[in-house]
């Protein structure tokens, strides 16, 4: 198992937005093979025993990114853009907060013409793009989490919320 660094580590904002744009601008629906190709084009390595798992620069051997699929169509992707620290310290907390703010500002700046709506939840911001792709960035106690949701999953989640089937805010707070 890869040992966690004492300090929080994250991609610089230019690398972060390169990853976000690649996923946001990709055509949808996306097959699992296309997702693997996209991950690998961004420098992530496929995890041979489980093709839906991927390894970022932050991990030597352990998968830290993944896709979910249904009928060979990608539903969402969790993309590692940081490596969690092993302890919560004031320095790590400040660095995580600053990085999260920088990432949010970069999305707002670089994707401003693509954003249809945004929703701020506790320690989370969700941007829905005009193409239906959903970007969720979450500030956690030891790292930052990036999820990309396919247009199909974005539509399903919105329909569930409109029918009041679940409260995603409460679920996300537990992450």
Residue spans for each PLM region:
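Short helix/turn-capping signatures at newly exposed starts of structured segments
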Residues: 1-121, 131-133, 140-175
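Minor-groove-contacting beta-hairpin "wing" of winged helix-turn-helix DNA-binding domains
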Residues: 125-127
């Amino acid at each position: 198992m890869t040992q966690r660094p004492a300090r929080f580590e994250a991609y610089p904002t230019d690398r972060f937005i390169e990853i976000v744009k690649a996923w946001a601008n990709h055509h949808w629906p996306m097959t699992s093979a296309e997702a693997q190709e996209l991950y690998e084009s961004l420098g992530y390595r496929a995890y041979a025993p489980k093709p839906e798992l991927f390894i970022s620069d932050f991990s030597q051997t352990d998968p830290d990114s993944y896709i979910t699929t249904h009928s060979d169509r990608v539903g969402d992707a969790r993309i590692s853009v940081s490596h969690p620290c092993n302890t919560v310290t004031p320095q790590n907390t400040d660095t995580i907060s600053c990085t999260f703010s920088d990432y949010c500002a970069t999305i707002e700046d670089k994707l401003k013409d693509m954003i249809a709506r945004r929703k701020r939840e506790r320690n989370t911001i969700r941007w829905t793009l005009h193409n239906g792709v959903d970007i969720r960035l979450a500030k956690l106690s030891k790292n930052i989490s990036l999820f990309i949701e396919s247009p199909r999953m974005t539509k399903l989640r919105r329909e569930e919320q409109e029918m009041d089937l679940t409260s995603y805010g409460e679920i996300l707070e537990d992450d």
